[in-house]
Amino acid sequence: MSTSLSHGKPDRSPLLAKVLNAHGGLENWERVRSLRADIVLGGPFWSMLGWPPAGLKLTASLDARREHITLGPFTEPDRIAVLDVEPERLSIQTTNGVLVEQRDDPRSSFPPFDPRTTRWDPIQVAYFLSAAHWNYLTQPFSFTYPGVDVREIEPWDEGGQTWRRLAVEFPKTNANHNADQVFYYDTDYMLRRMDYAPEVTANSPVAHYTHDPNTFDGFVFPARRRIHRRGTDGIADQSLAAITLDVARVTVEAELPDRQSDRRRSNRTDPDTRRHPGAAAIDDESTPA
């Protein structure tokens, strides 16, 4: 399903340009080669599918320029999941490279979704997580990649705030929840919410809220993500987060401006984890964003 992605000419709409600048700048992103993120996964969605309880810790390592990502440990302490492209393939390997299981075109293997009876196998869970996290960690810069259509739509009022919105259509070459998604930004141009409807869960509409934007190696990433059901009126049911994602650390590997060597964008041993000035103080994950 996926092919290599490289940077194209970005949509220069005023909102997208400001969002890119607020998240670290497109010119700086052009030098990024890879990212590594420590993630804690939770929520009742996973146990419903027969998977481990909340608190699963994963490390995601991804190529910033094409959809290639590894997640680990996965299923066993010495195993990792690898999503690659050309052709699209998901494999589970040991950390020393021994193949355990592999599937071409993993997306086509998902069964019809029924929350009461559906169970996913390891390949399917790994694919869902891998495709999601590659997109989460490369956005909003991946909005400038070839084949991605971006336009500003009418604003949205929520919680006494007005959020500007980008409607983004991803190409079929991008492994993602679904093609058409909407992203909501506050007055600091920080992402507050994203709406989509994953094809592999019967296009169930969700509202994915992001909290606590932090700066790591010069780029801004949400530290907390909470995913809720969304009604036909666009209102999210925030009484329960079906999926929770917490990002403890992101390390950005970038090429220096002189192009002489690959190294971190920053010379610091530890990434900059300063709270972004536009971050919302949210102590209860059920509190409306």
Where are the predicted features?
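N-terminal mature ectodomain segment of secretory-pathway/periplasmic proteins
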Residues: 2, 6-8, 21-103, 152
